[in-house]
Amino acid sequence: MSGTFSYDVKTKENEPLFEFNSAYSPRVSYHFNSKVSHYHYGVKHPMKPFRLMLTDHLVSSYGLHKIMDLYETRSATRDELLQFHSEDYVNFLSKVSPENANKLPRGTLENFNIGDDCPIFQNLYDYTTLYTGASLDATRKLINNQSDIAINWSGGLHHAKKNSPSGFCYVNDIVLSILNLLRYHPRILYIDIDLHHGDGVQEAFYTTDRVFTLSFHKYNGEFFPGTGDLTEIGCDKGKHFALNVPLEDGIDDDSYINLFKSIVDPLIMTFKPTLIVQQCGADSLGHDRLGCFNLNIKAHGECVKFVKSFGLPMLVVGGGGYTPRNVSRLWTYETGILNDVLLPEDIPEDIPFRDSFGPDYSLYPMLDDLYENKNSKKLLEDIRIRCLENIRYLQGAPSVRMDAECIPTQDISALTEEEDKIIQEMNEETEADSSNRLEEMEKENSGLIAFS
Protein backbone atom coordinates (compact mmCIF):
# COMPACT_ATOMS: atom_id res chain seq x y z
CA MET A 1 0.00 0.00 0.00
CA SER A 2 1.64 3.22 -1.13
CA GLY A 3 2.29 6.09 1.21
CA THR A 4 2.70 9.78 0.46
CA PHE A 5 4.46 10.99 -2.67
CA SER A 6 7.03 13.55 -3.70
CA TYR A 7 7.36 15.10 -7.14
CA ASP A 8 10.64 14.26 -8.88
CA VAL A 9 11.61 17.21 -11.07
CA LYS A 10 13.96 14.99 -13.12
CA THR A 11 11.52 12.26 -14.09
CA LYS A 12 8.43 14.50 -13.90
CA GLU A 13 6.73 11.76 -11.89
CA ASN A 14 5.47 11.24 -8.38
CA GLU A 15 7.77 9.04 -6.32
CA PRO A 16 6.64 7.19 -3.16
CA LEU A 17 8.49 8.29 -0.03
CA PHE A 18 7.57 5.21 1.98
CA GLU A 19 5.26 2.22 2.12
CA PHE A 20 2.91 1.22 4.89
CA ASN A 21 3.94 -1.89 6.77
CA SER A 22 0.38 -2.91 7.64
CA ALA A 23 -3.18 -2.25 6.55
CA TYR A 24 -4.03 -0.64 9.88
CA SER A 25 -2.05 2.13 11.51
CA PRO A 26 -2.60 3.61 14.97
CA ARG A 27 -3.59 7.23 15.39
CA VAL A 28 -0.32 9.00 16.06
CA SER A 29 0.12 12.59 17.23
CA TYR A 30 3.36 14.52 16.84
CA HIS A 31 3.99 17.34 19.30
CA PHE A 32 6.62 19.98 18.57
CA ASN A 33 7.36 23.68 18.90
CA SER A 34 10.15 24.84 16.62
CA LYS A 35 11.24 27.43 19.19
CA VAL A 36 12.64 24.69 21.44
CA SER A 37 15.46 24.00 18.96
CA HIS A 38 16.72 27.60 19.13
CA TYR A 39 18.11 27.41 22.68
CA HIS A 40 21.81 26.95 23.31
CA TYR A 41 23.48 25.29 26.32
CA GLY A 42 26.88 26.65 25.28
CA VAL A 43 29.48 26.25 22.54
CA LYS A 44 31.29 23.34 24.17
CA HIS A 45 28.25 21.69 25.75
CA PRO A 46 27.32 18.32 24.19
CA MET A 47 23.56 18.91 24.42
CA LYS A 48 22.45 20.55 21.17
CA PRO A 49 18.73 21.39 20.88
CA PHE A 50 19.45 21.93 17.18
CA ARG A 51 19.08 18.14 16.86
CA LEU A 52 15.33 18.66 17.27
CA MET A 53 15.13 20.93 14.23
CA LEU A 54 17.16 18.42 12.23
CA THR A 55 14.77 15.67 13.31
CA ASP A 56 11.71 17.70 12.38
CA HIS A 57 13.16 18.49 8.94
CA LEU A 58 13.90 14.81 8.31
CA VAL A 59 10.46 13.68 9.50
CA SER A 60 8.85 16.21 7.16
CA SER A 61 11.12 15.41 4.22
CA TYR A 62 10.06 11.76 4.40
CA GLY A 63 6.42 12.87 4.34
CA LEU A 64 5.61 11.48 7.77
CA HIS A 65 3.98 14.75 8.82
CA LYS A 66 1.19 14.00 6.33
CA ILE A 67 0.00 10.88 8.15
CA MET A 68 0.12 12.14 11.75
CA ASP A 69 -1.89 14.64 13.78
CA LEU A 70 0.48 17.59 14.15
CA TYR A 71 0.33 19.92 17.15
CA GLU A 72 2.32 23.06 17.81
CA THR A 73 2.74 22.87 21.55
CA ARG A 74 2.40 25.44 24.30
CA SER A 75 4.60 26.20 27.28
CA ALA A 76 3.91 24.44 30.56
CA THR A 77 2.63 26.67 33.35
CA ARG A 78 4.28 27.31 36.68
CA ASP A 79 1.52 25.38 38.46
CA GLU A 80 2.14 22.39 36.22
CA LEU A 81 5.83 22.35 37.11
CA LEU A 82 4.91 22.52 40.80
CA GLN A 83 3.09 19.20 40.57
CA PHE A 84 6.51 17.62 41.01
CA HIS A 85 9.22 20.24 41.45
CA SER A 86 9.66 22.31 44.61
CA GLU A 87 8.54 25.93 44.73
CA ASP A 88 12.04 27.13 45.59
CA TYR A 89 13.50 25.37 42.57
CA VAL A 90 10.81 26.57 40.15
CA ASN A 91 11.22 30.14 41.44
CA PHE A 92 14.97 29.86 40.89
CA LEU A 93 14.57 28.57 37.33
CA SER A 94 12.10 31.32 36.46
CA LYS A 95 14.35 34.14 37.68
CA VAL A 96 17.95 33.09 37.06
CA SER A 97 19.80 34.30 33.97
CA PRO A 98 23.40 34.64 32.76
CA GLU A 99 23.21 38.32 33.72
CA ASN A 100 22.20 37.80 37.37
CA ALA A 101 23.67 34.37 38.16
CA ASN A 102 26.85 35.78 39.69
CA LYS A 103 24.88 38.22 41.82
CA LEU A 104 22.97 35.53 43.69
CA PRO A 105 23.83 34.79 47.34
CA ARG A 106 26.92 32.62 47.77
CA GLY A 107 26.15 28.93 47.46
CA THR A 108 22.86 29.38 45.57
CA LEU A 109 24.11 27.93 42.29
CA GLU A 110 25.82 25.03 44.06
CA ASN A 111 22.69 24.28 46.10
CA PHE A 112 20.74 23.93 42.87
CA ASN A 113 23.44 21.79 41.23
CA ILE A 114 24.29 24.41 38.61
CA GLY A 115 27.60 23.75 36.87
CA ASP A 116 29.17 22.49 33.66
CA ASP A 117 26.55 19.78 33.08
CA CYS A 118 23.61 22.05 33.89
CA PRO A 119 24.64 25.62 33.06
CA ILE A 120 22.61 28.79 33.18
CA PHE A 121 21.92 29.94 29.63
CA GLN A 122 19.75 32.59 28.02
CA ASN A 123 15.99 32.02 28.47
CA LEU A 124 16.57 28.75 30.33
CA TYR A 125 13.11 28.77 31.94
CA ASP A 126 11.39 29.26 28.58
CA TYR A 127 13.27 26.25 27.22
CA THR A 128 12.21 24.00 30.09
CA THR A 129 8.56 25.01 29.87
CA LEU A 130 8.50 24.45 26.10
CA TYR A 131 9.71 20.84 26.14
CA THR A 132 7.60 20.09 29.21
CA GLY A 133 4.51 21.64 27.66
CA ALA A 134 4.94 19.39 24.64
CA SER A 135 4.96 16.27 26.83
CA LEU A 136 1.92 17.45 28.78
CA ASP A 137 0.04 18.24 25.57
CA ALA A 138 0.87 14.76 24.28
CA THR A 139 -0.35 13.32 27.57
CA ARG A 140 -3.70 15.07 27.22
CA LYS A 141 -4.26 13.59 23.77
CA LEU A 142 -3.79 10.13 25.26
CA ILE A 143 -6.05 10.87 28.21
CA ASN A 144 -8.80 12.16 25.92
CA ASN A 145 -8.53 9.15 23.60
CA GLN A 146 -7.51 11.42 20.72
CA SER A 147 -4.24 9.55 20.14
CA ASP A 148 -3.10 5.95 20.41
CA ILE A 149 0.54 7.03 20.34
CA ALA A 150 1.78 10.53 21.19
CA ILE A 151 5.34 11.60 20.30
CA ASN A 152 7.44 14.41 21.78
CA TRP A 153 11.08 14.11 20.77
CA SER A 154 11.98 17.27 22.69
CA GLY A 155 11.02 15.57 25.96
CA GLY A 156 12.49 12.65 27.85
CA LEU A 157 14.74 14.59 30.23
CA HIS A 158 14.81 11.82 32.79
CA HIS A 159 17.53 12.96 35.22
CA ALA A 160 15.89 16.09 36.68
CA LYS A 161 15.08 15.87 40.39
CA LYS A 162 12.44 17.53 42.54
CA ASN A 163 14.82 20.22 43.80
CA SER A 164 17.54 20.44 41.16
CA PRO A 165 18.64 19.79 37.59
CA SER A 166 20.88 16.87 36.73
CA GLY A 167 22.58 15.50 33.64
CA PHE A 168 21.51 18.26 31.21
CA CYS A 169 17.90 17.94 32.46
CA TYR A 170 16.17 20.80 34.30
CA VAL A 171 12.48 19.81 34.49
CA ASN A 172 11.39 16.18 34.52
CA ASP A 173 8.68 16.18 31.88
CA ILE A 174 8.35 12.39 32.17
CA VAL A 175 7.44 12.46 35.86
CA LEU A 176 4.96 15.29 35.30
CA SER A 177 3.33 13.38 32.44
CA ILE A 178 3.06 10.17 34.44
CA LEU A 179 1.50 12.02 37.39
CA ASN A 180 -1.24 13.26 35.06
CA LEU A 181 -1.71 9.83 33.49
CA LEU A 182 -2.09 8.17 36.89
CA ARG A 183 -5.43 9.90 37.34
CA TYR A 184 -6.82 7.82 34.48
CA HIS A 185 -4.59 4.74 34.34
CA PRO A 186 -4.23 2.20 37.16
CA ARG A 187 -0.80 0.92 36.05
CA ILE A 188 1.87 2.59 33.93
CA LEU A 189 5.05 0.99 32.61
CA TYR A 190 8.04 3.26 32.02
CA ILE A 191 10.76 1.87 29.71
CA ASP A 192 14.07 3.71 29.30
CA ILE A 193 16.61 2.76 26.59
CA ASP A 194 18.88 5.76 27.02
CA LEU A 195 22.58 5.06 27.61
CA HIS A 196 22.21 6.53 31.10
CA HIS A 197 20.08 5.25 33.96
CA GLY A 198 16.65 6.89 34.23
CA ASP A 199 17.32 7.86 37.82
CA GLY A 200 14.97 10.84 38.11
CA VAL A 201 11.92 8.85 37.07
CA GLN A 202 12.86 5.84 39.20
CA GLU A 203 13.36 8.05 42.26
CA ALA A 204 9.99 9.77 41.83
CA PHE A 205 8.06 6.48 41.77
CA TYR A 206 10.28 4.29 43.92
CA THR A 207 7.62 3.70 46.58
CA THR A 208 4.54 3.03 44.44
CA ASP A 209 3.25 -0.11 42.77
CA ARG A 210 1.33 1.85 40.14
CA VAL A 211 4.38 2.78 38.08
CA PHE A 212 6.89 0.14 37.06
CA THR A 213 10.22 1.66 35.97
CA LEU A 214 12.50 -0.37 33.70
CA SER A 215 15.86 1.00 32.57
CA PHE A 216 18.53 -0.47 30.26
CA HIS A 217 21.80 1.42 30.62
CA LYS A 218 25.57 1.46 31.08
CA TYR A 219 26.53 0.86 34.71
CA ASN A 220 29.77 0.34 36.57
CA GLY A 221 29.18 2.36 39.73
CA GLU A 222 31.06 5.36 38.36
CA PHE A 223 29.40 6.09 35.02
CA PHE A 224 26.84 8.91 35.31
CA PRO A 225 24.55 9.05 37.22
CA GLY A 226 26.12 6.26 39.32
CA THR A 227 22.81 4.50 39.95
CA GLY A 228 20.93 1.69 38.25
CA ASP A 229 22.30 -1.47 39.84
CA LEU A 230 20.33 -4.72 39.85
CA THR A 231 19.78 -4.30 43.59
CA GLU A 232 17.65 -1.16 43.09
CA ILE A 233 14.17 -2.69 42.95
CA GLY A 234 11.96 -0.16 44.75
CA CYS A 235 10.94 0.00 48.39
CA ASP A 236 7.88 -0.04 50.63
CA LYS A 237 4.79 -0.54 48.47
CA GLY A 238 6.97 -0.14 45.39
CA LYS A 239 9.33 -3.01 46.18
CA HIS A 240 9.92 -5.09 43.02
CA PHE A 241 8.35 -2.34 40.88
CA ALA A 242 11.69 -0.97 39.72
CA LEU A 243 13.98 -2.99 37.50
CA ASN A 244 17.43 -2.13 36.19
CA VAL A 245 19.45 -3.78 33.45
CA PRO A 246 23.10 -2.72 33.96
CA LEU A 247 25.28 -3.24 30.88
CA GLU A 248 28.96 -2.98 30.01
CA ASP A 249 30.56 -1.18 27.07
CA GLY A 250 30.08 -2.33 23.51
CA ILE A 251 26.84 -4.28 23.64
CA ASP A 252 25.78 -5.25 20.12
CA ASP A 253 22.45 -5.38 18.31
CA ASP A 254 21.53 -9.03 18.82
CA SER A 255 22.54 -9.14 22.48
CA TYR A 256 20.59 -5.99 23.31
CA ILE A 257 17.45 -6.94 21.38
CA ASN A 258 17.33 -10.48 22.77
CA LEU A 259 17.81 -9.29 26.34
CA PHE A 260 15.26 -6.50 25.90
CA LYS A 261 12.54 -8.78 24.54
CA SER A 262 13.19 -11.54 27.09
CA ILE A 263 12.54 -9.06 29.92
CA VAL A 264 9.85 -6.77 28.49
CA ASP A 265 7.55 -9.56 27.31
CA PRO A 266 7.05 -11.31 30.68
CA LEU A 267 6.98 -7.96 32.46
CA ILE A 268 4.06 -6.69 30.39
CA MET A 269 2.26 -10.02 30.73
CA THR A 270 2.65 -9.89 34.52
CA PHE A 271 2.30 -6.20 35.39
CA LYS A 272 -0.46 -5.61 32.81
CA PRO A 273 0.11 -1.88 32.26
CA THR A 274 -2.69 0.13 30.71
CA LEU A 275 -0.23 2.59 29.14
CA ILE A 276 3.49 2.61 28.36
CA VAL A 277 5.85 5.58 28.50
CA GLN A 278 8.86 4.91 26.27
CA GLN A 279 12.03 6.99 26.63
CA CYS A 280 14.14 6.69 23.47
CA GLY A 281 17.47 8.24 24.37
CA ALA A 282 19.72 8.12 21.29
CA ASP A 283 23.03 8.09 23.15
CA SER A 284 22.79 4.29 23.30
CA LEU A 285 23.61 4.28 19.58
CA GLY A 286 27.11 3.47 18.43
CA HIS A 287 29.34 6.44 17.55
CA ASP A 288 27.52 8.77 19.94
CA ARG A 289 29.69 11.60 21.23
CA LEU A 290 29.16 10.48 24.84
CA GLY A 291 28.31 6.86 24.13
CA CYS A 292 29.93 3.47 24.59
CA PHE A 293 27.46 1.00 23.02
CA ASN A 294 27.49 -0.49 19.50
CA LEU A 295 23.79 -0.27 18.66
CA ASN A 296 22.63 0.45 15.14
CA ILE A 297 19.55 2.52 14.39
CA LYS A 298 17.43 -0.48 13.40
CA ALA A 299 18.30 -2.33 16.62
CA HIS A 300 17.25 0.62 18.78
CA GLY A 301 14.10 0.89 16.69
CA GLU A 302 13.39 -2.82 17.06
CA CYS A 303 12.91 -2.24 20.80
CA VAL A 304 10.36 0.48 20.10
CA LYS A 305 8.64 -1.75 17.54
CA PHE A 306 8.44 -4.59 20.06
CA VAL A 307 6.85 -2.38 22.71
CA LYS A 308 4.38 -1.04 20.15
CA SER A 309 3.38 -4.60 19.19
CA PHE A 310 1.49 -4.99 22.49
CA GLY A 311 -1.09 -2.50 21.22
CA LEU A 312 -1.17 -0.34 24.35
CA PRO A 313 -1.37 3.46 24.36
CA MET A 314 2.13 4.95 24.28
CA LEU A 315 3.74 8.24 25.21
CA VAL A 316 7.05 8.34 23.34
CA VAL A 317 9.74 10.87 24.25
CA GLY A 318 13.36 11.54 23.35
CA GLY A 319 16.22 11.89 25.79
CA GLY A 320 19.99 11.78 25.39
CA GLY A 321 21.84 11.79 22.11
CA TYR A 322 24.85 13.93 21.30
CA THR A 323 25.64 13.29 17.65
CA PRO A 324 22.79 15.31 16.07
CA ARG A 325 22.82 13.67 12.63
CA ASN A 326 22.35 10.22 14.19
CA VAL A 327 19.81 11.44 16.73
CA SER A 328 17.66 12.79 13.91
CA ARG A 329 18.10 9.60 11.88
CA LEU A 330 17.00 7.47 14.82
CA TRP A 331 13.98 9.50 15.86
CA THR A 332 12.81 9.80 12.25
CA TYR A 333 13.13 6.03 11.82
CA GLU A 334 11.21 5.45 15.05
CA THR A 335 8.55 7.95 13.98
CA GLY A 336 8.12 5.72 10.95
CA ILE A 337 7.93 2.60 13.10
CA LEU A 338 5.24 4.15 15.30
CA ASN A 339 3.24 4.93 12.15
CA ASP A 340 3.76 1.42 10.73
CA VAL A 341 5.67 2.67 7.70
CA LEU A 342 8.94 1.55 6.13
CA LEU A 343 11.35 4.37 5.27
CA PRO A 344 13.81 4.04 2.37
CA GLU A 345 17.50 4.23 3.10
CA ASP A 346 18.35 7.29 1.01
CA ILE A 347 18.00 10.62 2.79
CA PRO A 348 15.54 12.78 0.77
CA GLU A 349 17.17 15.25 -1.60
CA ASP A 350 15.16 18.26 -0.48
CA ILE A 351 15.96 18.20 3.24
CA PRO A 352 17.57 21.34 4.71
CA PHE A 353 21.10 20.74 6.05
CA ARG A 354 21.39 17.59 3.94
CA ASP A 355 25.18 17.78 4.09
CA SER A 356 24.89 16.84 7.77
CA PHE A 357 24.13 13.29 6.62
CA GLY A 358 27.06 12.91 4.24
CA PRO A 359 29.05 11.32 2.85
CA ASP A 360 26.73 8.28 2.62
CA TYR A 361 23.38 10.14 2.95
CA SER A 362 21.88 6.99 4.45
CA LEU A 363 19.20 6.72 7.11
CA TYR A 364 20.92 3.57 8.37
CA PRO A 365 24.70 4.11 8.67
CA MET A 366 26.78 1.36 10.27
CA LEU A 367 27.40 2.29 13.91
CA ASP A 368 28.48 -1.04 15.42
CA ASP A 369 32.24 -1.09 15.00
CA LEU A 370 33.69 1.25 17.61
CA TYR A 371 33.81 -0.55 20.97
CA GLU A 372 34.82 -3.97 22.22
CA ASN A 373 31.81 -5.87 23.51
CA LYS A 374 32.46 -6.51 27.20
CA ASN A 375 29.08 -8.14 27.77
CA SER A 376 29.73 -11.87 27.90
CA LYS A 377 26.94 -14.38 27.34
CA LYS A 378 27.25 -15.42 30.97
CA LEU A 379 26.92 -11.83 32.19
CA LEU A 380 23.82 -11.21 30.10
CA GLU A 381 22.24 -14.51 31.14
CA ASP A 382 22.88 -13.73 34.81
CA ILE A 383 21.24 -10.33 34.36
CA ARG A 384 18.27 -11.89 32.59
CA ILE A 385 17.75 -14.47 35.33
CA ARG A 386 17.93 -11.82 38.06
CA CYS A 387 15.41 -9.66 36.21
CA LEU A 388 12.98 -12.53 35.68
CA GLU A 389 13.22 -13.42 39.37
CA ASN A 390 12.19 -9.88 40.25
CA ILE A 391 9.26 -10.02 37.83
CA ARG A 392 8.05 -13.28 39.43
CA TYR A 393 7.81 -11.47 42.76
CA LEU A 394 5.03 -9.30 41.34
CA GLN A 395 2.56 -12.21 41.46
CA GLY A 396 0.27 -10.53 38.97
CA ALA A 397 -0.87 -6.99 38.39
CA PRO A 398 -1.62 -4.99 41.55
CA SER A 399 -5.21 -3.95 42.19
CA VAL A 400 -5.44 -0.21 42.66
CA ARG A 401 -7.88 2.49 43.60
CA MET A 402 -8.26 5.50 41.34
CA ASP A 403 -8.35 8.29 43.89
CA ALA A 404 -5.98 10.88 45.28
CA GLU A 405 -4.61 8.60 47.97
CA CYS A 406 -3.21 6.27 45.31
CA ILE A 407 -1.31 8.92 43.35
CA PRO A 408 2.30 8.93 44.64
CA THR A 409 2.84 11.99 46.81
CA GLN A 410 6.18 11.33 48.49
CA ASP A 411 8.55 14.12 47.43
CA ILE A 412 5.79 15.59 45.27
CA SER A 413 4.31 19.05 45.90
CA ALA A 414 0.62 19.87 46.13
CA LEU A 415 -1.59 19.72 43.09
CA THR A 416 -3.17 22.84 41.64
CA GLU A 417 -6.56 23.92 42.98
CA GLU A 418 -8.32 22.91 39.77
CA GLU A 419 -6.84 19.42 39.86
CA ASP A 420 -7.65 19.10 43.57
CA LYS A 421 -11.27 19.86 42.73
CA ILE A 422 -11.34 17.12 40.10
CA ILE A 423 -9.85 14.58 42.50
CA GLN A 424 -12.28 15.65 45.25
CA GLU A 425 -15.17 14.94 42.89
CA MET A 426 -13.70 11.51 42.19
CA ASN A 427 -13.41 10.82 45.93
CA GLU A 428 -17.09 11.67 46.45
CA GLU A 429 -18.20 8.89 44.14
CA THR A 430 -19.50 5.77 45.82
CA GLU A 431 -17.32 2.71 46.36
CA ALA A 432 -19.65 0.79 44.03
CA ASP A 433 -19.05 3.24 41.20
CA SER A 434 -15.31 3.04 41.76
CA SER A 435 -15.42 -0.75 41.69
CA ASN A 436 -17.43 -0.78 38.46
CA ARG A 437 -15.03 1.68 36.88
CA LEU A 438 -12.03 -0.48 37.71
CA GLU A 439 -13.74 -3.62 36.40
CA GLU A 440 -14.40 -1.86 33.11
CA MET A 441 -10.76 -0.76 32.90
CA GLU A 442 -9.55 -4.30 33.49
CA LYS A 443 -11.80 -5.66 30.73
CA GLU A 444 -10.72 -3.07 28.19
CA ASN A 445 -6.93 -3.64 28.35
CA SER A 446 -6.39 -0.08 27.17
CA GLY A 447 -7.73 1.22 30.46
CA LEU A 448 -8.11 4.67 28.96
CA ILE A 449 -11.01 6.41 30.71
CA ALA A 450 -11.24 10.18 30.59
CA PHE A 451 -13.36 11.88 33.22
CA SER A 452 -15.14 14.96 31.96
Swiss-Prot record:
Record-listed E.C. numbers: 3.5.1.98
Cellular-component GO terms for this entry: cytoplasm; nuclear periphery; nucleus; Rpd3L-Expanded complex; Set3 complex
Region of interest (Histone deacetylase), ranges: 26-340
Database matches in InterPro entries: HDAC_PDAC, His_deacetylse, His_deacetylse_1, His_deacetylse_dom, His_deacetylse_dom_sf, Ureohydrolase_dom_sf
Sorted UniProt keywords: Activator, Chromatin regulator, Hydrolase, Nucleus, Transcription, Transcription regulation
First-tier enzyme category under EC: hydrolase
GO molecular function annotation: histone deacetylase activity; histone deacetylase activity, hydrolytic mechanism
Any Pfam family hit: Hist_deacetyl
Catalysed reactions listed for this entry: N(6)-acetyl-L-lysyl-[histone] + H2O = L-lysyl-[histone] + acetate
Stretches for region Disordered: 428-452
Subcellular location(s) per record: Nucleus
Keyword Transcription: yes
Active site: 197
Keyword Transcription attributed: yes
GO biological process: cellular response to starvation; DNA damage response; epigenetic regulation of gene expression; negative regulation of meiotic nuclear division; positive regulation of stress-activated MAPK cascade; positive regulation of translation; regulation of DNA-templated transcription
More about this protein: Present with 4890 molecules/cell in log phase SD medium.
Family assignment from sequence similarity: Belongs to the histone deacetylase family. HD type 1 subfamily.
Descriptive protein name: Probable histone deacetylase HOS2
Organism per entry: Saccharomyces cerevisiae (strain ATCC 204508 / S288c)
